């Protein structure tokens, strides 16, 4: 089974929540930090507890590599151990690496993150050097069932600086990117009807959601922007099709849910689970 079909099936079974393991050392409850003063062990212990508590209610996990690179080799060892544990648990893994280079460099990125210790099911990519920046990843999609999520329209305030610029034919840049990815993705459709070439589609501008979903009908979405950035569950539903076709990321909202509860630090993993369930149910009620 290809990874896009695995992800589709996981959404159908567990809901749309993508737990973002964007873990900083400062997120660790004090008792856990004292128990694991070593950065590698502390980060992994926290991640493992979050994974164990959310595995049955999370469609997938997104691991942002920068949070681990920031701590040097200790952080990268924690990253590797986290990916290995997710593979052991047969969870769908999105490595949030946002690579965007070309030629041999892109070939090395593809090899690094689709094989070996950094192996993930999906990775995130930036398309702004052109479609040839995606080419080195395509053999892994075709031959190994891997997948990518390419930036289309992001949820940050600065997205308007480039993504919203008009092109010569009046379309915005992100419209052009989305259509090019949809066309490219037709050659990599899973049995579920969605392509292994997915897109990152922020949910903070829902007024265009129905049109986007109609045009990009075979593009599976990784959807940021829920919660703190203003995206609502009722908006997210507009980016889905027949209750599937996208996963919704939450990182700090889940990882730091314990900070909103009295004595939550002692039960940080349970608090994360409760928040993931709340988020899942919030989205489902609008489907």
Regions from the PLM with identified roles:
Residues 1-63, 68-81, 85-93, 264-287:
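Conserved N-terminal beta1-alpha1 strand-loop-helix module at the mouth
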Residues 13, 58, 115-121, 142-148, ...:
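Glycine-enriched alpha-helix->loop->beta-strand junction motifs that scaffold or abut catalytic
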Residues 18-22, 146-155, 247-250:
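Non-cysteine beta-strand/loop elements that form the S-adenosyl-L-methionine
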Residues 70-85, 102-107, 129-142, 204-213, ...:
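Active-site-adjacent beta->alpha loops and helix N-cap segments on the catalytic face
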Residues 203-249, 253-257:
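A C-terminal functional module that forms or caps the active site or interfaces directly
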């Amino acid at each position: 089974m290809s990874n896009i079909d695995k992800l589709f099936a996981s959404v159908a079974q567990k809901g749309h929540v993508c737990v973002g393991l964007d873990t900083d050392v400062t997120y660790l409850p004090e008792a856990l930090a004292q128990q694991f003063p070593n950065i590698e062990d502390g980060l992994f212990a926290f991640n493992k507890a979050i994974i164990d508590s959310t595995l049955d209610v999370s469609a997938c996990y997104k691991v942002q590599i920068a949070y681990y690179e920031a701590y040097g080799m200790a952080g990268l060892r924690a990253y590797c151990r986290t990916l290995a544990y997710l593979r052991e648990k047969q969870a769908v893994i999105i490595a949030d690496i946002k690579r965007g280079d070309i030629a041999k460099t892109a070939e090395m990125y593809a090899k690094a993150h689709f094989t070996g210790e950094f192996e993930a099911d999906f990775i995130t990519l930036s398309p702004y050097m052109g479609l040839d920046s995606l080419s080195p990843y395509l053999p892994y999609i075709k031959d190994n069932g891997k997948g990518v999520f390419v930036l289309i329209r992001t949820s940050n305030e600065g997205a308007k600086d480039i993504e919203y610029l008009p092109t010569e034919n009046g379309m915005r840049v992100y419209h052009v990117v989305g259509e090019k990815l949809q066309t490219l993705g037709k050659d990599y459709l899973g049995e579920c009807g969605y392509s292994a070439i997915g897109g990152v589609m922020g949910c903070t501008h829902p007024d265009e959601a129905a049109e986007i979903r109609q045009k990009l009908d075979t593009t599976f979405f990784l959807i940021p922007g829920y919660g703190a950035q203003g995206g609502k569950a009722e908006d997210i539903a507009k980016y889905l099709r027949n209750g599937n076709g996208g996963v919704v990321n939450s990182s700090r909202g889940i990882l730091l849910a314990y900070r909103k509860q009295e004595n939550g630090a002692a039960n940080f993993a349970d608090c994360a689970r409760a928040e993931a369930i709340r988020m899942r149910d919030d989205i489902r009620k609008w489907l």
